[in-house]
Every structure is written in C-alpha cells, then in structure tokens.
Amino acid sequence: MSALLSKTIKTEKTEKEYPDWINTLTYLYPNKNLCKFSDNCFNTCLKTSGRLPMATKAMINRTKLLYQDNDTFINNLENELRKAKKSANKKGKKLAYRFNGTSDRFEEIKHFLDMDNQPFHQAYDYTKDFKRVLDYQGYKGYNLTFSYDGLNNLEAKFLLKNKIANVSIVMTTKRNEELPKTYNLNGIDYPVLDGDKHDLRFTENKGYIIGLRAKGKAIKNNGSFVQSI
C-alpha cells in the first residue's frame, strides 16, 4: 500500500529555509471530484509537473483508497501523521502538514483539525474555494492561501484588500529567473513573495501575492490560469 505522506524537493527546500519545521504533504491524483473549481487549471495541474511513473501510481492508489475505503484512508493517514509528529517532537521540531498537495478537499483535513490532539502542529493549504477561506481561515490554526486562476479577480481583490488571505498566482517566470517585485491585480500593485523558496505559507503576513513559477504543462499554457510576466 502506498504511503499517504510525501516528501519532495519543495519540502526539502522548506526544511532548509525553516530548520525548526518538518514539512510533509499528501498527493492525490487530481480529478474534478477532488477539485471542484478546477475548470481553468485542470489541464495544467501539478500532476503534470514531471512526476515519475511510480509517483503517479502512488497518487492513483491513494485516491482509490480515499474513495473506496475512506475510513481506512483516514485511519492510515492519522497513523502516519502521528508518527511524523512524534519524530518531529524528538528532534525538537514541529510538523507542518498540507493535505491538498494536488487536490482541493476539506472533509478529511477538517476531521483532523477538530481533534483535541491534532496529529500535526500546523495545517495549511491552497484553495480556490472562496467561501472556505472566508469561513475557515484560522480555524483551529488552519492557514489558507487563495489560488488565483485568472477569473476569480474579485474574490482575490477582496481577500488581499482585507488581508484575510494571501493569493497565489502561477507566472510564466522561468525557474532560473527572479519573480517580479510587484504584481498588478485589478489596478492595484501588490508585493510579491517567492512561493517556490518554501511552502510554509502560514509564516507570512497577509496582503501579498505568492508568486509560483509555471511547471509541467503549465509552462506552455495559454489559458487564464498562468499569468504572463
């Protein structure tokens, strides 16, 4: 059975940037049931960002378990998280967990947030669900970053203006190039933070654009999801 927690180059970079934290994620195989707001980004999803066949197979296996035996999925995930948290504690560190590495669900992570003894020290996610951000930003420590897709301008503007959440934007900036210092959204210039340097979005103040470089099929995307720089 595939492990439900994953380590990546991004989590390694995160742990170097923040040595007091252990970072782990869950990667499911994206589909429109997992990501109900995926119409504008599904074809350029992170599932295409250079994953090897074995990694893709593991994502599919996790997703099958989620749908076919959700109770077992939840139990196995809790066991893995508690083991990771215990390991982090022994090292004098904290565990930061992102459930939606390649999905946009809430039921499972809310289950863990509602526990008296959460199986992590900090949970965070990216989401395109505007109402979820309004209702659950800060819920029992949960941190949310709103994902911009080129069409949810008004929602992004509201969250930035009121400093409710930062907004992530995928840009055409190449991997070896610097992201712009500011980005104009709806006529307003917002400061940009480099979201590729680490993944601990909960460490950042609100009111920022989180710039992400396009990866996989998104590099050649001409749709609304990836923003030209």
Model feature map: region roles:
Residues 1-229:
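Class I S-adenosyl-L-methionine
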